[in-house]
């Protein structure tokens, strides 16, 4: 399974999964149709599936148009997003499986950013492969999504699920927010040398116009404050130890950063 990263809108990424053996493709969170159609045309591929993580327009905006071009494709989304995702045909819940090419993905229910948010985790099939996590707006490079419909407790539980995945998992988040997220992270975890090194690396990447997605989950665990609510240095900075309270305080600080 090849993964193509397609920039869209101002800072979104659409991810196109391509199976060369069958010349079929699936897309995750198509914000707009043109990048998808152009990539499909270059590959000579047929679109067979859309995997939506949640209902926000910048993740489902191309559903209807792509369905018009490929009327036999199947549109997947969370069961609690019924009526909110255009064209949705399959309603997924925690523990369900989705198949594409030779890979089988696991559905994770990760409410917080929205009440119905899901993520797709494709574990490695072969020893040389990595796991692939498509997490929408739940986890970002160096950050996480705002709480539009969920609570801090829900988000901590959701991020715990993601944090428990293998360290070498690639994190395909839906926005290019990493640099600003790391700038904030340094304000709450200023003595973290791994974080400082990552910040300088990401700053150089962005200066050169390079993407910072995907990131590696192991690096997120060491540098992303929203996966480090139980870190003693961050707890000391925040002045709290309860996970949901630490997370809620961090999220509130980031919202006004």
Curated annotation (Swiss-Prot):
Metabolic or biological pathway: Secondary metabolite metabolism; methylglyoxal degradation; (R)-lactate from methylglyoxal: step 2/2
Stated role: Thiolesterase that catalyzes the hydrolysis of S-D-lactoyl-glutathione to form glutathione and D-lactic acid.
NCBIfam families: GSH_gloB
UniProt keyword terms in alphabetical order: Hydrolase, Metal-binding, Zinc
Note describing how the cofactor binds: Binds 2 Zn(2+) ions per subunit.
Cofactors required: Zn(2+)
Positions contributing to Zn(2+) 1 binding: 54, 56, 113, 137
GO biological process: methylglyoxal catabolic process to D-lactate via S-lactoyl-glutathione
Lineage: Bacteria, Bacillati, Cyanobacteriota, Cyanophyceae, Oscillatoriophycideae
Family note: Belongs to the metallo-beta-lactamase superfamily. Glyoxalase II family.
Tree of life domain: Bacteria
Subunit structure: Monomer.
Molecular function in Gene Ontology: hydroxyacylglutathione hydrolase activity; metal ion binding
Gene3D superfamilies: Ribonuclease Z/Hydroxyacylglutathione hydrolase-like
Gene behind the chain: gloB
Catalytically driven reaction(s): an S-(2-hydroxyacyl)glutathione + H2O = a 2-hydroxy carboxylate + glutathione + H(+)
Protein name: Hydroxyacylglutathione hydrolase
Residues holding Zn(2+) 2: 58-59, 137, 175
Pfam families: HAGH_C, Lactamase_B
EC number(s) from the headed UniProt entry: 3.1.2.6
């Amino acid at each position: 399974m090849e993964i193509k990263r397609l920039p869209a809108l101002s800072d979104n990424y659409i991810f196109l999964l391509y199976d060369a053996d069958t010349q079929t493709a699936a897309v995750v969170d198509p914000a707009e149709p043109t990048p998808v159609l152009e990539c499909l045309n270059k590959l000579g591929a047929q679109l067979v599936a859309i995997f939506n993580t949640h209902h926000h327009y910048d993740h489902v905006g191309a559903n209807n148009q792509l369905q018009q071009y490929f009327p036999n494709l199947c549109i997947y989304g969370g069961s609690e997003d019924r009526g909110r995702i255009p064209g949705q045909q399959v309603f997924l819940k925690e523990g369900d499986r989705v198949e594409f090419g030779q890979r089988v993905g696991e559905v994770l229910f990760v409410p917080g950013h929205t009440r119905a948010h899901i993520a797709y985790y494709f574990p490695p099939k072969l020893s040389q492969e990595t796991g692939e996590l498509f997490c929408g707006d739940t986890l970002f490079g160096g950050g996480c999504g705002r709480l539009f419909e969920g609570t801090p407790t829900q988000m901590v539980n959701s991020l715990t699920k993601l944090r428990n995945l293998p360290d070498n998992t690639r994190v395909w988040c839906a926005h290019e927010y990493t640099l600003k997220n790391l700038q904030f992270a340094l304000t709450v975890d200023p003595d973290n040398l791994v974080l400082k090194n990552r910040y300088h690396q990401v700053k150089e990447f962005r200066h050169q116009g390079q993407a910072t997605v995907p990131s590696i989950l192991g690096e997120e665990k060491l540098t992303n404050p929203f996966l480090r609510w139980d870190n003693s240095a961050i707890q000391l900075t925040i002045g709290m130890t309860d996970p949901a309270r630490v997370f809620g305080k961090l999220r509130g600080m980031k919202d006004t950063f």
